[in-house]
Structures are given as C-alpha cells and as structure tokens.
Amino acid sequence: MVIANKNIIFVAGLGGIGFDTSREIVKSGPKNLVILDRIENPAAIAELKALNPKVTVTFYPYDVTVSVAETTKLLKTIFDKLKTVDILINGAGILDDYQIERTIAVNFTGTVNTTTAIMSFWDKRKGGPGGIIANICSVTGFNAIYQVPVYSASKAAALSFTNSLAKLAPITGVTAYSINPGITVTPLVHKFNSWLDVEPRVAELLLEHPTQTRLQCAQNFVKAIEANQNGAIWKLDLGTLEAIEWTKHWDSHI
C-alpha cells in the first residue's frame, strides 16, 4: 500500500475534487495528511479528522503564487515536524480565462515552484531520500477546450513539466505522474469565463457533455496513487481510470 502509514502533503486539498480526494486518502490510512490551501475551512478539517481518527490531519495556509523561497520556508516547517514526507500532491487550479496571469501563476507556475521547493528536501544529489509527486493536470492538456485557451495551455504546460520530472527520476530520486480529470461536476465548471468572451455559454455547453462525479474522480485518483507508476499519464474520465500512451512526434535524443 502506497498511502498507508505515509506522510502526504496535499496542495489545494480542500477544493472541489481535492476535498473528495482528501476524504478517500484519509480512508486509506496515511500517518499524516498535511493540507495546504489558500482559505482555511475548519469544518472540512474536522470532517477529515472524524473520518479516520488514526490519521493526523493538519492545515497550513498557502498561496501557490508565492516565491520558491517562501514555499521552501513553509516546507521546512513541515519537514521539521514530520521528519519525512513521502508524497506531494499539487492540486491548485482555477478556470477563468479573464484572469490570464493568475491562471498561469496558479495552474502552472505554482506547480513548478512548489515542486522546485520540495526538491531541496528530496533530491538524492543533496542526500535526500527521494519522493513521489502527483500533479493534477487535465484532459485539456491532451486536447484543448479552445474557448478557454489560457486554461488549456496552462494544463498542457503542467503535463509537460510532469512528464519531464518522471524522466529526471534516475537523477533526482523523485518520481512523478499526472492526474488528468475529464469533465467533473465541481463548482469550477458551473460558471467560468471564456477568453475574450468568445463563447459566453461555454460552461453551459460543457455540462451538456457526459460528466463524472467528484467521488468517482477521487476514488480513481486514489487508485492511481496506489499504482505509483512513474511517468504515468492518468486519464480520469466518465468514472474510469486509464493510463494513456503519449504519441511521440519528436525526440531530442539527449
């Protein structure tokens, strides 16, 4: 079991898919679940603690748009307390193509910066023990929802970054895989803005397509964590879990 008795940091573990996934993780019996999120939700934390009293659930306020130095400082506090951390889940995300800079900052740069910060503690070249990174990306990283090109591009960037992390595992000792949900019924998709208002009804149109519940997505997320497959590109769509093959059109040969 990958989750049982492990120490896990979950960035944005109180959000839509994030909170349902936190529930499923707690059921699987980690030693510690550390949730980093922008807004504290004491009721949600209490619910997680009650779900499995054997699991220590803690919360720290965290905005993924802060600097690597600020993130490193927070992670040091966590590592000093827990001594070891086994898994980092990067789950922060927004869907609003009106907010171009913030979309990129949260969906991509935040993932890169949080990952960069934890490397100070995990990188085997620095004497670290290695670790596991699960990055929540999106099926829009495979094929864009063209009405929200900024969101789609930010998720494609996060996916590419994750694929590179996986290939760097022999050097760093840190493995990685991506979690790519399809259309999931969350507050994120009920109302959002298209880029330059190219399609005012984009949210409504999207929800006309088949969807999955947050619980279905969360349960498959936990299955992906337990599979612990470095480099996997997991598609979580319509209640199913599938490791997809990435088509290679070019190779640097280095």
UniProtKB/Swiss-Prot annotation:
Sections of the chain in a coiled coil: none
Q: Sorted alphabetically, which InterPro entries does this protein's record hold?
A: ADH_Drosophila-type, NAD(P)-bd_dom_sf, Sc_DH/Rdtase_CS, SDR_fam
What is a GO molecular function of this protein? Answer: alcohol dehydrogenase (NAD+) activity
Which Gene3D superfamilies does the entry link to?
A: NAD(P)-binding Rossmann-like Domain
Keyword GTP-binding belongs to the record? no
Superkingdom of origin organism: Eukaryota
The entry's keywords? NAD, Oxidoreductase
Entries under CDD domains matching the protein: ADH_SDR_c_like
Q: Single GO cellular component annotation?
A: cytoplasm
Active site (UniProt): 151 (proton acceptor)
Q: Name one GO biological process term.
A: alcohol metabolic process
**Catalytic activity as recorded in UniProt:** a primary alcohol + NAD(+) = an aldehyde + NADH + H(+); a secondary alcohol + NAD(+) = a ketone + NADH + H(+)
Quote the Pfam families the UniProt record gives.
Answer: adh_short
The residues listed in the UniProt record as binding NAD(+), with positions renumbered to this chain, are 10-33
| Keyword Transferase among record annotations | no
Top-tier EC class: oxidoreductase
Q: How does it assemble?
A: Homodimer.
Record family assignment:
Belongs to the short-chain dehydrogenases/reductases (SDR) family.
- Recorded protein name is Alcohol dehydrogenase 2
Species, as recorded: Drosophila wheeleri
Taxonomy-wise, where does this protein's organism fall, top ranks first? Eukaryota, Metazoa, Ecdysozoa, Arthropoda, Hexapoda
